[in-house]
């Protein structure tokens, strides 16, 4: 058995979602080397794991772009810097101080870094599962799913989508032309989503492409051997209906956990890490946080804000790694992409 490797880098980036990938790009633009570490076995974070085919509408310059396409573009952007990755690894330990950190993974690797960027999204995440009898068996066959990776997998199916927020409505709209039938179940009469999504939902309901079932909530599953034959829904008054569906997609949000990160000595609040807005530095000097995990007054949990935070963190890190080199701000149109580090 060989010893696990020891790696050295300027900046260790924990999390390889959009914010982490762009932080690696910004480090490269400042001629800082970086290393990406992620618990998933691929880069992309939630964009890759949860909605690779779901269109994203608020990325500047892209009227609509799928999660997978966004990640592909970010990978192309960092390609000139040949950023190494440790995928399928969880960072368990962090020790040291500003300018000299040591990180340890659950696979035994040791990483020495001058600074650390935490781009861990909401940390480890998983779906909030509905409390339904026999749920495990239907999950095992794929009759109940919490993520849509390929819309084509739902062609010709009868789908119950449960939830009242953006995810439920977005997927109802995205699947309405694939599915034979879609029921959208919500325990309240009103949905909470972007105004444009609500407008499109009203159009789809009027056209008969989606049927709203309100105010109902999930009550039971019908079927044998993991084959779903119907979803039972009920009102608070006890009125029940059976919807003859063969797929159930519950969208009740994600449960999140920072895991070991919460025990590294920096402040944390409900799976987020407070940072200085101008630099994204945490209360642990030399450790920065960007993307959804970063918290400060006025924070918007948008991908594009994570991009901005990655740039701010990289610029704040430069004097830590290159204390004797002055950093003169330049536009990328002027300096281009630096040669590989």
Swiss-Prot record:
SUPFAM superfamilies, alphabetized: FAD/NAD(P)-binding domain
Binding locations of FAD: 38, 46, 51, 91, 125, 292, 333
A GO molecular-function descriptor: ferredoxin-NADP+ reductase activity
Keyword Magnesium: no
Catalytic activity entry: 2 reduced [2Fe-2S]-[ferredoxin] + NADP(+) + H(+) = 2 oxidized [2Fe-2S]-[ferredoxin] + NADPH
Protein name: Ferredoxin--NADP reductase
Pfam families per UniProt: Pyr_redox_2 (PF07992)
């Amino acid at each position: 058995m060989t010893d696990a490797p020891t790696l050295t880098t300027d900046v260790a980036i924990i999390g390889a979602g959009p914010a982490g990938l762009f932080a690696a790009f910004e480090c490269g633009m400042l001629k800082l080397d970086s290393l990406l570490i992620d618990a998933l076995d691929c880069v992309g974070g939630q964009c890759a794991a949860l909605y690779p085919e779901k269109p994203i509408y608020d990325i500047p310059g892209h009227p609509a772009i799928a999660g997978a396409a966004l990640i592909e573009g970010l990978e192309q952007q960092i390609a000139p810097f040949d950023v190494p990755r440790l995928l399928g690894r969880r960072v368990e330990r962090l020790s040291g101080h500003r300018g000299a950190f040591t990180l340890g993974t659950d696979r035994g690797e040791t990483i020495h870094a001058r600074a650390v960027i935490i781009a861990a999204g909401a940390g480890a995440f998983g779906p909030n599962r509905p409390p339904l009898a026999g749920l495990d068996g239907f999950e095992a066959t794929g009759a109940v799913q919490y993520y849509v990776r390929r819309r084509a997998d739902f062609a010709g199916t009868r789908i119950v989508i449960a939830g009242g927020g953006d995810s439920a409505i977005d997927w109802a709209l995205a699947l309405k032309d694939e599915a034979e039938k879609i029921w959208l179940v919500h325990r309240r009469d009103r949905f909470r989503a972007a105004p444009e999504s609500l407008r499109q939902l009203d159009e789809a309901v009027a056209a008969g492409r989606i049927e709203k079932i309100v105010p109902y909530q999930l009550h039971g599953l019908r079927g044998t051997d993991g084959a779903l034959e119907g979803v039972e829904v009920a009102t608070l008054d006890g009125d029940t209906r059976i919807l003859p569906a063969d797929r159930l997609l519950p969208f009740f949000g994600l449960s999140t956990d920072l895991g070991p990160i919460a025990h590294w000595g920096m402040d944390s609040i409900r799976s987020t890490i407070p940072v200085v807005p101008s630099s994204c530095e945490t209360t642990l000097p030399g450790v920065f946080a960007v993307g959804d995990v970063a918290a400060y007054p006025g924070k918007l949990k948008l991908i594009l804000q994570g991009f901005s935070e990655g740039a701010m963190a990289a610029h704040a890190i430069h004097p830590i790694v290159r204390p004797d080199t002055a950093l003169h701000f330049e536009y990328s149109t002027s300096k281009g992409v630096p040669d590989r580090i």
